[in-house]
From Swiss-Prot:
It comes from Rhizobium etli (strain CIAT 652). InterPro entries: Flavoprotein-like_sf, RNR_Ib_NrdI_bac, RNR_NrdI. The gene is nrdI. One of its GO terms (biological process) is protein modification process. This is Protein NrdI. HAMAP family: NrdI. Belongs to the NrdI family. Pfam families: Flavodoxin_NdrI (PF07972).
Length: 134
C-alpha cells in the first residue's frame, strides 16, 4: 500500500486521525526551514484552515511541500479534514489541492474524524492502492 503524507498543526487533530489509521505515514514538518522530500506515490491528508471567505484554506507548509515538483509528481489523491461550522469552506483544502494537482478528492472528515471515518478511509485506501497498481 502507498504512503500517507499529512500535515497537522499544534491541535494534533489530523495527526490523531492518521495514527488511528495504522498505515505507513510521513508528517510534513511544521517548520518551513525543514526540507521534506517524497519520492514515492502518496495520498495527502490535510486540514483546512479558512475563515468564511475561503482564503488560506491550504496550510503554507503543504503549499511549500507541493510546490516542489518532485513531491507533487507523486501525489495520487487527497483527503481533507475540516470543521462543518464553516459551511461552504468545510474541507476546502481538499477541493483546492484536488483541482490544482489534478488528483481525486477521496474523502472529507470533521476535526479528528469518527471511528466510522477511520474505517472508511482504511478500507478506501486498500481499494484505492489496489486500483493504482493495476
Amino acid at each position: 500500500m502507498g504512503l500517507i503524507v499529512y500535515y497537522s498543526s499544534r491541535s494534533e487533530n489530523t495527526h490523531r486521525f492518521v495514527a488511528r489509521l495504522g498505515l505507513r505515514a510521513a508528517r510534513i514538518p511544521a517548520s518551513g526551514a525543514d526540507a521534506f522530500h517524497i519520492r514515492e506515490p502518496f495520498v495527502l491528508v490535510v486540514p483546512t484552515y479558512s475563515s468564511g471567505d475561503g482564503k488560506g484554506a491550504v496550510p503554507k507548509q503543504v503549499i511549500r511541500c507541493l510546490n516542489d515538483a518532485e513531491n507533487r509528481k507523486h501525489i495520487r489523491g487527497v483527503i481533507a479534514a475540516g470543521n462543518s461550522n464553516f459551511g461552504e469552506t468545510y474541507g476546502l483544502a481538499g477541493d483546492v489541492i484536488s483541482r490544482k494537482c489534478q488528483v481525486p478528492y477521496l474523502y472529507r472528515f470533521e476535526l479528528m474524524g469518527t471511528e466510522e471515518d477511520v474505517a472508511n478511509v482504511k478500507h478506501g485506501m486498500e481499494r484505492f492502492w489496489t486500483r493504482e497498481q493495476l
